[in-house]
Design a protein with these regions (language model features):
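General helical secondary-structure elements
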Residues: 5, 25-26
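Polybasic, lysine-rich low-complexity intrinsically disordered segments
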Residues: 3-6, 17
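Active-site-proximal alpha-helix that buttresses catalytic centers in soluble enzyme cores
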Residues: 28-337
Length: 337
C-alpha cells in the first residue's frame, strides 16, 4: 500500500483539500482507511439477509430505477437467496469470524506496522466495521491527513466508486474535513504484480494450466466507463487496447493484470485462460464464465488447474467457497485431477 500510494491517483470524488503527494504535510498526523466490500456479521440467514439488503440496494451495485430495485431485492432476492448463501458462509467461517473481515484486519495491522506514525483502520462498504466507524476512529485519533484506500486493484462503479463516494458522504456527516488522498486502481503496478506472481509461481507445474478468475460485472457497468460511447463492445478486442476510452474500464484493468502476470511468469497464450465469476441476476455479464471455462478446460484434456483471483486482496466467499469448493468440484467432475 505504501509503495503503490506513491503512484496513486489523486482524489476524483471530492474537491475538498486535495493533497498531491503523500507525506507532503509530514507535520500532521496521518491515517489510512482500508476499505473492502464487506461481509455478514454471522453465518446465519438473518445476518446474510441484513448484509444483502444493504449491499444490493446500493444504486451503484444494481443501477436500475429505485422502485424496480426495491421490488427486485426486497420482493425476490431477499426472500430466497439468504437461505441459499448462509450454508456457504458456514462452510468457510473461522473461529475469529468472517474470513474477509479477519484477513482485511490482518492486512490493516500489517500496513500500520510498516508505515511510521500512521493510524490504519478498516472500513467495510457494507456491514461491519463500517466505513463510518473507521472514519470516526481516525477522527478521534487526531488524524489530519487521510488516505482513502479501496482494496480493489481494478476500478469499478460497484466497488471503488461506491466506496469512495460513501466515504466522503460519511466524512461530511461526522463533520470531518481532513486533507485527503485516494488510492486509485493499480492493475499492473509492479508492487501489486510482483508479489502476486511470487504467490502463484510455487503452484505451477510443467503441465498445469493457469486460470485468472475475476469477479464478474454487468455489461452495462462496463459500458458506462466508456465516456466516448464508441469503444466498449464496439471495437474488436476492446479490452486489450489501452486508450483514454477504456482507462477506467474494469474489464480492461483485468486484462492488464492478466497480461502483466502471464508475461512475468513466462507463460504462452495456451498456458493460461481468463474468466469471470459470481454472476447475479438475469442481466448480461462479462464472459466467459468461470464455470463454463473450467468445464471446457477439463473436457479438452487439462488435468492440472491453478486458479488465481487477482480481484480479491483478501479471501472471502468468492475464493474460499465458490472457487475452492464449487469450482474445484466442477473441474473434478469433468475429469480434471
Amino acid at each position: 500500500i505504501k509503495k503503490i500510494t506513491n503512484n496513486g491517483r489523486i482524489n476524483h470524488y471530492s474537491k475538498q483539500n486535495i493533497t498531491t503527494t503523500w507525506g507532503y504535510f509530514d507535520h500532521m498526523k496521518r491515517g489510512v482507511l482500508l476499505m473492502n466490500i464487506g461481509t455478514p456479521d454471522e453465518p446465519n440467514v438473518e445476518s446474510v439477509r441484513t448484509y444483502l439488503r444493504e449491499f444490493l440496494l446500493d444504486p451503484d451495485v444494481i443501477d436500475i430505477p429505485t422502485p424496480l430495485r426495491h421490488l427486485l431485492v426486497r420482493g425476490i432476492i431477499l426472500k430466497t437467496r439468504p437461505k441459499k448463501i448462509a450454508p456457504r458462509y458456514q462452510s468457510i467461517w473461522m473461529e475469529e469470524g468472517s474470513p474477509l473481515r479477519v484477513f482485511t484486519q490482518k492486512m490493516t495491522d500489517a500496513v500500520e506496522q510498516n508505515m511510521d506514525d500512521t493510524v490504519c483502520e478498516v472500513g467495510m462498504r457494507y456491514g461491519n466495521p463500517s466505513i463510518r466507524y473507521g472514519l470516526e476512529r481516525l477522527k478521534k485519533s487526531g488524524v489530519k491527513e487521510v488516505l482513502l484506500a479501496p482494496l480493489f486493484p481494478h476500478h469499478a462503479q460497484a466497488t471503488t466508486e461506491s466506496s469512495l463516494k460513501f466515504a466522503y458522504k460519511q466524512m461530511k456527516e461526522i463533520n470531518w474535513n481532513p486533507l485527503t488522498k485516494e488510492l486509485g486502481h493499480f492493475p499492473n503496478n509492479p508492487n501489486f504484480i510482483d508479489p502476486l506472481v511470487e504467490s502463484i509461481r510455487p503452484y505451477l507445474q510443467e503441465d498445469s494450466h493457469l486460470l485468472f478468475s475475476y469477479h464478474g460485472l454487468p455489461i452495462s457497468h462496463v459500458k458506462r466507463s466508456d465516456k466516448s460511447g464508441k469503444h466498449c463492445q464496439k471495437v474488436e478486442n476492446c479490452c486489450g487496447i489501452s486508450l483514454d476510452a477504456n482507462s477506467m474500464c474494469y474489464a480492461h484493468h483485468c486484462s492488464l493484470t492478466t497480461e502483466a502476470v502471464s508475461k512475468k511468469l513466462g507463460l504462452s497464450k495456451v498456458d493460461w485462460s481468463m474468466s469471470y465469476q459470481s454472476r447475479l441476476g438475469p442481466a448480461k455479464w462479462l464472459k466467459p464464465s468461470t464455470t463454463e471455462t473450467v468445464q471446457n478446460l477439463a473436457r479438452n484434456g487439462i488435468k492440472k488447474l491453478v486458479i488465481v483471483s487477482p480481484a480479491f486482496l483478501a479471501d472471502g466467499l468468492e475464493t474460499l467457497e465458490e472457487l475452492d469448493i464449487e469450482i474445484r468440484e466442477e473441474f473434478l467432475s469433468e475429469g480434471g485431477e
